[in-house]
Structure formats: C-alpha cells, structure tokens
Amino acid sequence: MRRVTLHCAARLVIAALWLLVEVCRAESGAQSLAERVIWAVNAGGDTHTDVHGIQFKKDPLEGKVGKASDYGVRLPILRSSPEDQILYQTERYNEDTFGYEVPIREEGDYILVMKYAEVYFAQSQQKVFDVRLNGHVVVKDLDIFDRVGHSTAHDEIVPFSIKRGKLSVHGEVSTFNGKLTVEFVKGYYDNPKICALYVMKGKLEDVPKLQPHPGLEKREEEEEEEEEGEGPEGEKKSASTSPKNPVRSGPRTPNPYATDNSSLMFPILVAFGVFIPTLFCLCRL
C-alpha cells in the first residue's frame, strides 16, 4: 500500500511540475520579431540582416522593373541605427506604377512596413505618390520630405487582416487570392519609389519604432500646448492649421513593466498545492 501511495504521489508532483514548466516555456518562448516576418526586401540593394534579425532579401525586381539607386549611400540617415542605414540609402523607383507581390498562405493579422528616406529633393511637393494594397489606397499623397525632411528615415505602417478569403484594410474589404500586391502609384510629382519593405504577422505594437525626431517632437508639443490653451474657437483654428498628413513612424513602444504575469500564478499555486499535501502524506508514512 505504501508503494502504491508513493507512486501516485510522485506522479502528481511530476505532473504539476511539468505543467509549470510548459506554461513558463509558452510565456518565454513567444516568436521573435524576425520569426514573425514572412517576407522582406531591400529595394534596390543586396541582402541585409537588420538589428532585429529581420533578413531582407536582394531586390527581386532587379533587371525587371524600374531602376535601382544607391545615391543615398553618401548621406547619413537620421532616425536609423548605423547598422541599418543601408535600408534607407538604397531604393527602387520607376517612371510608372510598379510593385511587389507577397505570397501569404495563412489567415491572420498582418502588418506591412514600408521604409523611406528622401535623399535627393530638398523641398516638398517634388515627389508625391500613393501606395495601393490589392487595389486599396492605403497611403495617399506621400511626400517624404514634407513628413520628415531630407535624409531622414520614415516608416509607413499599414495593418491589415486576412480572414475567410477576404482582405480587410482601412475599413475596406476585398477577395484575397493568396497574393498581396503592394503598388507604388505614379502621380503628378516625379516618380514613385520604395527603399525597403517587409510583411509580418502581428499587431501595430509589435513593430519597432524609429529613433525620435527632435524637430517633429517639438512641433507636436507646440501644437498640443496651443490646443490646451485655446477655447472652442481656438480648437477650430488649430484643427484647420494642423498638417494634412500626420507622421506615421510607428506605434509607441510598449512598456515592458506593464506586462500582466498573472497567467504564471495559477500553475505555481497548483504545483505548491499538490506538492505540500503529498510531502505531508509521505512524512506520515
């Protein structure tokens, strides 16, 4: 009888400890950013692995569509880490609309990240174009210089989802056939271009944020102070003078200390709840 009791107690303890280990592994073994990226290209450039481990492939349009340019390699790119400036220094442009096709086989929530830097023009309204995603306009009148200035990194971030054979983006829905087409649309001002881009599974908060832009932050703070100091009439005036195209350089970095670890408490309590009575029974035997 004692042997049977000891055997059962040991099995209970092992089961509780296994449950604890599995939960801890699930919490700490979440996919890294690089593992969630399903497709990445360094437009107009060669392969590159960035500081987050994302592996950008060589431009598949080389020799097929548009022209590659490395004009920006002579310039330092603000807001980008030194290791990843090459992603903003090279680019592909075309005198007409062009784009890339991204195969997507699984349903879920995705993010398209497009990297830009204006390395040629020194004023706004010189290069303006749209970006389409499977026919949906997701970026309208993109003027890189107007957004961030010269030789400065800028990321356009577009969340979308694929569910039940439908693509949903910016409140619009269309049939999805397994290929995501990202198009850079020729406008009235110069040629459309792209420096680098990638598609990843996840949410907006999963996208790495660019380094701060002092000029933009100062302008945003001044606008906030004006809005706080004015009444209803001032609010109307502030709204009319606000920039037409807000800067989209990525979501705010999540606070790592705000993570809820309550999911770990249950298996720990279970383990102790099983271990202590078992130990007590063993001592009595």
From Swiss-Prot:
Say yes or no: keyword Endoplasmic reticulum present: yes
Glycosylation: which residues? N261
The secretion signal range is 1-26
Name the residue ranges with Acidic residues bias. 220-232
What keywords tag this UniProt record? Carbohydrate metabolism, Endoplasmic reticulum, Glycoprotein, Membrane, Signal, Transmembrane, Transmembrane helix
Record topology, Lumenal segments = 27-262
The name of this protein is Malectin
Record the organism.
Danio rerio
